[in-house]
């Protein structure tokens, strides 16, 4: 398994967000699904130590994530947040910023292509992009780190139907071209069926089901 959570509990503002969660996420395309407030985004942040549990263990490729340097882990297991958080400046400058953190010289044109953006977007200013374009620029910036895992926190929740379809198509196409596992957070079970092979379902901070999407989310 790529990730394993064993009896994980975490609190925020003295409120239990996840309670006694035991779950597994394999390599490939996984998702964490559930209603708003079920703890999905918190679980995602445990995977690269943007949050640490109150109790229990989170393992990445069999090793406790607390044994890893947090910054190194976050370059390898990269979060694309729900709301775009681009730096001021051009898309290329955003990509180069991430690549510099990883000590790499980025192929900007290729990264834009992987993210479903044309080369002309390199010189576009982040503040002039639509929300859907910002989301794909965030993806290009994340890919500049050459991560092994992408954590996708509700990447289409703020998009209209057309933009949502474009981002989904980009992610599906990306998996065919790059060896990267994805963990998608979504409240939309139809999206989970389209985008993932494995699902962990949460409700009120507890796991209520997990396994292959075809079994757990059968129509």
Regions found by a protein language model. Give the residues of each.
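Helix-to-loop junction immediately C-terminal to a conserved catalytic motif
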Residues: 48
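Conserved ABC ATPase "signature" region
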Residues: 105-121
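Catalytic Walker B motif of ABC-type/P-loop ATPase nucleotide-binding domains
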Residues: 150-154
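Conserved ABC ATPase signature
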Residues: 125-129, 133
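Conserved ABC transporter NBD signature motif
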Residues: 56-64, 73
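Helix N-cap at the start of a conserved alpha-helix in ABC-type nucleotide-binding domains
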Residues: 161-163
């Amino acid at each position: 398994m790529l990730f394993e959570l064993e009896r994980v509990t975490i609190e925020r503002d003295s409120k239990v967000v996840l309670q006694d969660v035991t779950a597994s996420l394999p390599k490939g395309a996984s998702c964490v699904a559930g209603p708003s407030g079920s703890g999905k985004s918190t679980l995602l942040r445990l995977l690269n130590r943007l949050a640490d549990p109150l109790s229990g263990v989170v393992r990445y490729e069999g090793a406790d994530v607390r044994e890893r340097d947090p910054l190194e882990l976050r370059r390898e297991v990269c979060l694309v947040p729900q709301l775009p958080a681009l730096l001021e400046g051009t898309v290329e400058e955003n990509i180069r910023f991430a690549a510099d953190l990883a000590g790499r010289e980025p192929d900007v044109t290729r990264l834009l292509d992987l993210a479903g953006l044309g080369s002309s977007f390199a010189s576009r200013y982040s503040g002039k992009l639509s929300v859907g374009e910002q989301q794909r620029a965030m993806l290009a910036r994340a890919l500049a780190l050459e991560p092994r895992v992408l954590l996708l926190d509700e990447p289409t929740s703020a998009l209209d139907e057309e933009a949502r379809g474009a981002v989904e198509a980009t992610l599906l196409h990306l998996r065919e071209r790059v060896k990267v596992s994805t963990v998608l957070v979504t409240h939309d079970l139809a999206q989970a069926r389209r985008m993932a092979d494995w699902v962990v379902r949460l409700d009120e901070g507890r796991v209520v089901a997990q396994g292959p999407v075809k079994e757990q989310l059968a129509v």
